[in-house]
Regions:
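Gly/Ser/Thr-rich phosphate-binding loop
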Residues: 115-171
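Conserved AMP-binding A3 loop
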Residues: 16-43, 50-52
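Conserved pre-ATP/AMP-binding loop-to-beta segment of ANL
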Residues: 3-20, 53-56
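AMP-binding/adenylate-forming catalytic core of the ANL superfamily
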Residues: 208-292
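Conserved C-terminal "lid"/linker of ANL adenylate-forming enzymes
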Residues: 257, 269-271, 283-323
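AMP-binding/adenylate-forming
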Residues: 32-40, 56-111
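AMP-binding/adenylate-forming core of the ANL superfamily
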Residues: 184-212, 218-219, 273
Length: 323
């Protein structure tokens, strides 16, 4: 979708817009969202960040998904100067002057950190929000040194982008997400986060994210997804936690997945962009406990991802099951 096409949709008399989920756990799903709720979400973010009318805002994500659409809505609602570049892994290469405000996915931030010119521009952004994927411990440690405000976002298409932020830069850096005013969270019987955000979502939303709520009853942190649990021989293993243990030691793209097994119920499978399986086995033996050890290693040309760069877990499970 082009910027002109989206603005035409936005300016149409219809009170709703058709959007699609990212497809990280399966096929992208269509859903209708209310424009007034998108406007409300935009105001909440811009107000929280302290953005001013006329501030520059970088649009570097596809307009097919909610993250890109919301950047345009923020610019319209708050009077920001929108700078559009083609969505790619090196968005900052396309601009000369760093924007005041930018929203990026972790891959774009990572790529910019590897290039001296891009890194310099990244460090001059006044307000940077990062969403659409996990932020590694290594990236978080680097971003802690960023001189301005950098945030990790928590949200989804159903909440019209994010409903909570956690600080990544400076002494205020935290692993806990702080919900916006008017947003309340709780945990259900399955340990999953429930979001009550009436401004942007008409009904309370039960997520698939296994979460922990802080003692203050407001802040929360995410452990992983309910559908990313491997139940192997009666032991529950969280895929994201296993990947986090391995990420500092494996220098090729990889994913942990699972396959059904007649003896254990489910077993751990590692999918990686390498044929050096023995090295992977050595690292796993050193860094994972005995229950977490992969039963199978699969070499692939490329790790399956969605159009927004998230791991395509459903596709990975297909690979794990059929190879």
């Amino acid at each position: 979708m082009t910027l002109e096409e989206f603005i035409n949709q936005w300016q149409s008399p219809s009170p709703t817009l058709l959007v699609h989920t990212s497809g990280s756990t399966g096929k992208p799903k269509p859903m209708l969202v209310e424009k007034r709720r998108m406007e409300a979400s935009a105001r909440i973010t811009c107000s929280f960040l302290g953005l001013k009318r006329g501030d520059s805002a970088l649009l570097c994500m596809p307009l097919d998904y909610i993250a890109g659409k919301m950047m345009v809505v923020r610019a319209i609602v708050w009077g920001l100067q929108l700078i559009e570049v083609s969505p790619c892994g090196h968005s900052l290469k396309q601009i000369d002057t760093p924007p005041v405000f930018a929203a990026m996915v972790p891959m774009q931030v990572y790529n910019s950190m590897q290039d001296d010119d891009e890194r310099q521009k990244l460090w001059q952004i006044k307000h940077l929000i990062i969403g659409g994927g996990a932020i590694s411990d290594e990236m978080a440690a680097e971003l802690r040194l960023h001189p301005n405000a950098v945030w990790s976002t928590y949200g989804m298409t159903e909440t019209l982008s994010h409903i909570a932020l956690r600080r990544l830069s400076g002494p205020q850096a935290s692993e806990w997400y702080e919900p916006f005013d008017g947003v309340n969270v709780s945990i259900n019987a399955d340990g999953c986060l429930v979001i009550d955000a009436p401004t942007v979502c008409a009904l309370p939303l039960t997520t698939n994210d296994i979460a922990e709520i802080a003692a203050d009853g407001r802040r929360f942190r995410i452990r992983g997804r309910k559908d990313n649990v491997i139940c192997s021989g009666g032991i529950k293993l969280q895929i994201e936690e296993m990947e986090a243990k391995l990420r500092p030691y494996i220098n090729v793209p990889f994913l942990i997945s699972k396959r059904s097994d007649p003896k254990f119920g489910e077993t751990v499978v590692m999918i990686a962009e390498t044929n050096d399986i023995e090295s992977l086995k050595t690292i796993c033996k050193e860094r994972l406990n005995k229950y977490e050890q992969p039963h199978k290693y699969i070499a692939v040309d490329s790790i399956p991802t969605t159009e927004t760069g998230k791991p395509a877990r459903a596709k990975a499970m297909e690979i794990a099951q059929t190879h």
